[in-house]
Amino acid sequence: AILEADDDVELLEGYLKDWEAFVSSAAAFEK
């Protein structure tokens, strides 16, 4: 269960990084 939780955290962190990259690129596009 602990290993699965660690995998979930890594997955969420990956989504967060993708989201931050999307937001930053969108902000740059709007300027």
From Swiss-Prot:
Localization (cell): Plastid, Chloroplast thylakoid
Entry keyword set: Chloroplast, Plastid, Thylakoid
A GO cellular-component term linked to this record: chloroplast thylakoid
Additional observations: On the 2D-gel the determined pI of this protein is: 6.2, its MW is: 16.0 kDa.
Protein name, UniProt field: Unknown protein from spot 104 of 2D-PAGE of thylakoid
